[in-house]
């Protein structure tokens, strides 16, 4: 029998106790769409003009939460930051003339209110079969590297299956 022990980082995460997980992205603009939905979603409809991550996080903090996690990319493949790896992201939307960055606004707001910040990235993607394996690996590693080096996260959250 294997003796598995949690890492120091996993144990520290347990001490965080109470937090929020935000699932916000392109699909919020498509009523009735679900995970693994086969219908296309045009990035040009993404325009959260009233996005106020600071308001979300002030509410979380007031409720006693100590951390918040943002979904950076989910199964639809849309990146909530202006990734250099692919075009299906906030950089090709009307929101802030393609200069917006949901992940930056979220991570900055977490720090402003004194909350730990985590990022969720789904490695699974509904159009993944359109990539050859090496191309997808490069795309995946490139995006993960952007998130881990560009946003100073407290705990990166990544699952192999969702």
Regions found by a protein language model. Give the residues of each.
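Mature catalytic domains of secreted/periplasmic carbohydrate-active enzymes
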Residues: 1-162
């Amino acid at each position: 029998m294997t003796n598995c022990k949690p890492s120091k980082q996993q144990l520290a995460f347990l001490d965080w106790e109470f937090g929020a997980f935000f699932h916000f992205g392109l699909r919020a603009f498509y009523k009735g769409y679900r995970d693994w939905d086969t219908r296309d979603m045009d990035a040009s409809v993404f325009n959260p003009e009233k996005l106020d991550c600071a308001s979300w996080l002030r509410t979380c903090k007031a409720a006693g939460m100590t951390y918040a996690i943002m979904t950076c990319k989910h199964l639809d493949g849309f990146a909530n930051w202006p990734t250099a790896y692919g075009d299906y992201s906030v950089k090709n939307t009307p929101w802030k003339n393609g200069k917006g960055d949901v992940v930056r606004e979220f991570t900055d707001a977490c720090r402003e209110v004194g909350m730990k910040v985590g990022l969720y990235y789904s490695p699974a993607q509904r159009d993944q079969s359109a990539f050859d394996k090496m191309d997808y690996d490069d795309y995946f590693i490139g995006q993960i590297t952007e998130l881990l080096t560009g946003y100073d996260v407290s705990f990166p959250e990544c699952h192999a299956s969702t």
